[in-house]
UniProtKB/Swiss-Prot annotation:
GO BP field: cell division; proteolysis involved in protein catabolic process
Binding site for Zn(2+): C10, C13, C32, C35
GO CC term (a single one): HslUV protease complex
Keywords noted in UniProt: ATP-binding, Chaperone, Metal-binding, Nucleotide-binding, Zinc
Job description of the protein: ATP-dependent specificity component of the Clp protease. It directs the protease to specific substrates. Can perform chaperone functions in the absence of ClpP.
Official protein name in the record: ATP-dependent Clp protease ATP-binding subunit ClpX
Length: 440
């Protein structure tokens, strides 16, 4: 097998990498900085000869597409914490305390960026450091949705990463730099825009080490990943391979400063409440006023509110990692009432989505209040949070969505509690013109 050629040269002019200032690598080809400048001159000459051609051509370039807000947003345009929470309320049901914590943390972060952009640091030489966020809550409680909604409000690049796929450098899996690559891609490869973005790292509890004590064997997908994430969370100049580092080792890296990137980590941390109970010294017994004990999920959420950093260390997170995520928000499990609200209240509510789908076939879809309650009850029994709602509605609507597009005589479809509980047939209302007429 032939060895790699260490004497790289431009595929267009043939000059070696020693003869040019920069050699850019592509899939099996290379181009030098001189050829890039020559190509730009040729394009500029062609565009100059065609009337009104320059503007559309520049707008169509994805890497130069402007965002709807200016890159240096003045402080007066940063949404206030109350405005951020009100926006979250439109999309995320419940979790008021967690949304308040998120709103304050995000506001302070982008207020800090506005101060850096305006160069009004003052004479006190006080440097404002960022505060990354940790969201703790059961699956389907709104952790990812909250982070996505924040990115939508602030109009900044946003990327979601799964911590379970990350491994220490040199082992099979993804490098931590791939997280930054996703953010860079979502920013249309605009480095300056990516450096102001938000990264949400999901399943962060899955990289906890197996025991509180350091192990003599390497934990490449647990403690090793935590160690690799330390500098990125705190702020460093990271070298990001634009095509991914594992399959394309010979490429120029893009440098990204992570100092101003806001990291939001989320995880379920199953069993963490037991660690807190051991520290407190007694099991928390919650009672409501009429003497009935609190539900197990509600009691677990109350225990988690007594969380201290040492509890996370005992769970398997290293102290250095916890120290870089100072803001902690606990999300409560969703009860039946919250699940019912998720179906109908948010701006992008699930039932509104199906009603819009049915209107495209000229059919009005109705859900009886008792049917909504029955869907929420079934989702609560499945113990997967809001994610169970779509699965249940899909099961209920399967036959309806299969038959309706082929029938032009229908005007209205009503989902009843019997259909939810027994999967019976929906109530259909025909168009008046489709009803049979009685002959005299």
């Amino acid at each position: 097998m032939a060895k790699y050629d260490t004497h790289l040269k431009c595929s267009f002019c043939g000059k070696s990498q020693e003869q040019v200032r920069k050699l850019i690598a592509g899939p099996g080809v290379y181009i030098c900085d001189e050829c890039v400048e020559l190509c730009n001159e040729i394009l500029d000459e062609e565009l100059a000869t065609v009337p009104n051609a320059a503007a559309p051509r520049r707008e169509s370039t994805p890497s130069r597409s402007p965002r709807s807000t200016p890159r240096s947003r003045p402080l007066s345009q940063v949404p206030k914490p109350r405005q951020i929470k009100e926006f979250l309320d439109k999309h995320v049901v419940g979790q008021h305390e967690a949304k308040k914590i998120l709103a304050v943390a995000v506001y302070n972060h982008y207020k800090r960026l506005s101060l850096l952009d305006s160069d009004q640091r003052g004479d006190d030489n006080v440097e404002l450091q960022k505060s990354n966020i940790l969201l703790i809550g059961p699956t389907g409680s709104g952790k990812t949705l909250s982070a996505q909604t924040l990115a939508k409000l602030l109009d900044v690049p946003f990327a979601v990463a799964d911590a379970t796929t990350l491994t220490e450098a040199g082992y099979v899996g993804e490098d931590v730099e791939n997280i930054l690559l996703r953010l860079l891609q979502n920013a249309n490869m605009d480095v300056e825009e990516a450096q102001r973005g938000i990264i949400y790292i999901d399943e962060i509890d899955k990289i906890a080490r197996k025991s509180e004590n350091p192990s003599i064997t390497r934990d490449v997908s647990g403690e090793g990943v935590q160690q690799a994430l330390l500098k990125i969370l705190e702020g460093t100049i990271a070298n990001v391979p634009p095509q991914g580092g594992r399959k394309h080792p010979y490429q120029d890296c893009i440098q990204i400063d992570t100092t101003n990137i806001l990291f939001i980590c989320g995880g379920a941390f199953v069993g963490l409440e037991k660690t807190i109970e051991q520290r407190v010294g007694k099991k928390a017994m919650g009672f409501v006023r009429d003497g009935e004990p609190l539900p197990k999920e509600k009691r677990s959420a109350d225990i988690l509110k007594q969380l201290e950093p040492h509890d996370l260390v005992k769970y398997g997170m290293i102290p250095e990692f916890i120290g870089r995520i100072p803001v902690v928000a606990v999300l409560e499990p969703l009860d039946v009432a919250a699940l019912a609200d998720i179906l109908t209240q948010p701006q992008n509510a699930l039932l509104k989505q199906y009603q819009k789908l049915m209107r495209m076939d000229s059919v009005e879809l109705r859900f009886e209040p008792a049917a909504v309650e029955a869907i929420a009850q079934e989702a609560y029994r499945r113990k997967t949070g809001a994610r169970a709602l779509r699965a249940i509605v899909e099961e209920i609507m399967l036959d309806v969505m299969y038959e309706l597009p082929s029938r032009k005589d229908l005007r209205e479809c009503t989902i009843t509690p019997e259909m939810v509980e027994k999967r019976s047939t929906a109530e259909l209302l025909l168009h008046p013109s489709s009803l049979p007429t009685l002959s005299a």
